[in-house]
Amino acid sequence: MEITFLGTSSGVPTRTRNVSSVALRLPQRKEIWLFDCGEATQHQLLRSDLRTSQIRRIFITHMHGDHIFGLMGLLASCGLAGTVSQIDVYGPPTLDRYIASCLRWSVMRLPYKLQVHTVEPGEVFSDGEFTVTCRLLHHRVPAFGYRVTEGDRPGRFHVEKAQALGIPFGPLYGQLKQGKTITLEDGRTFDGRDFCDPPQRGRSMVYCTDTVFCDSAVELAQQADVLIHEATFSHQEANLAFARLHSTSTMAAQVAAFAQVKLLFLTHFSARYAPGNPVQVEDLLAEAQAIFPNTRLAQDFLHYAIPRDGQICAEMPPSDSPAAANIDTLEATLEPLEAQTVAADAKNAPAIAINRATRQQMQQKLGIDATTANAILERRRQQKFTCLGELERLYPQVDWSALNVLF
Ligand SMILES: [Zn+2]
Ligand SMILES: [Zn+2]
């Protein structure tokens, strides 16, 4: 389960943050599930290393424009690409009418099956491997939080142990794998649980936006590996948060603490906290961390692979490190305005390029040896690179400046 943030701004896009969308990539089934689809989400997908053709399900939280205005464009482009056979869209009542109206009045015909599901609190989707549930949050219009839960996996079966005890091959091994007790013809009895490691706990991700603090978010997020929660406002703007039914940084942290999640990502920031303003997103992070220390800031294109063992993944730089924050600091320091956007794009292009490159390309274009290329590939396999600073820190011997020109 790999999360990529495609939009982390509330209401309107800023130069460095697009409006809401989060991609969940499920590598084992080559599928991407999107959560919200703000305007220009398809442009963000093109700038990421995700493949639009893998989008299989789209979950919409609510009908506000910053969460759905990119939906129709993306669905249309998926049709033109001709590589999609079915997309299922889930969302609140009126989403089906919105989609039907757009299709009708823009005379759009999709060459694939589009299934629109109106969700209600409870189970939304389940196929044995993954279950998606939702709860009604507390916003100005009906808004749903979603939880994706992966099923537990059976622990490893120690076949060599069974062989050593002389248990004959065949159906008995299947029964042992299932943890059942078997009796051999010679009268010996074995408990299958003695031959299997404990089951691997399935992972979970919860997405709560838009909402003011509410109990249903706490219930939905119980013990989740990752909670992505909106933090539109800083703590000192709590009055605004209550008036507009959005969350402050401290409300998000309280949900995380009450739900005992492992990791909290703050997202959906008001543009008033953009670089150069008196209060910035780093201040929201500090407020949240005072309540829930394991909090990080989401930023566009930030990638996080949820580890299987329930540990916090240490591969990603912490959100307040220079590497992760470099887009924001760039923007705060560079002039003129046009140069800022170009510089931010160019600065992180190498990270995107290296996430796509083959080993041969790396060796040729960067002039590095096979050992270094393999080390980079191995690191990439564990965790995609999110910014140039991370690459520079890990592999200072490589001249990264050539990458964005060459790939
Ligand atoms: Zn919103
Ligand atoms: Zn909203």
From Swiss-Prot:
> Where along the chain is Zn(2+) 2 bound?
66-67, 210, 268
Q: Which keywords has UniProt assigned to this entry?
A: Endonuclease, Hydrolase, Metal-binding, Nuclease, tRNA processing, Zinc
- Could you cite one Gene Ontology molecular function of this protein? zinc ion binding
Q: What InterPro entries does the record point to? A: Metallo-B-lactamas, RibonucZ/Hydroxyglut_hydro, RNase_Z/BN, RuvA_2-like
Give me the reactions it catalyses.
Endonucleolytic cleavage of RNA, removing extra 3' nucleotides from tRNA precursor, generating 3' termini of tRNAs. A 3'-hydroxy group is left at the tRNA terminus and a 5'-phosphoryl group is left at the trailer molecule
Q: Where is this region: Unknown?
A: 309-407
Return the cofactor note field: Binds 2 Zn(2+) ions.
What SUPFAM superfamilies does this protein map onto? Answer: Metallo-hydrolase/oxidoreductase, RuvA domain 2-like
Which major enzyme category is it? hydrolase
Entry annotation: catalytic residues: 66
- Positions of region (Ribonuclease Z): 1-308
* Cofactor dependence: Zn(2+)
Assigned EC number = 3.1.26.11
* Assembly behavior: Homodimer.
- Function, in words: Zinc phosphodiesterase, which displays some tRNA 3'-processing endonuclease activity. Probably involved in tRNA maturation, by removing a 3'-trailer from precursor tRNA.
UniProt-recorded name of the protein: Ribonuclease Z
Q: Which organism is it from?
A: Thermosynechococcus vestitus (strain NIES-2133 / IAM M-273 / BP-1)
Q: Which gene encodes it?
A: rnz
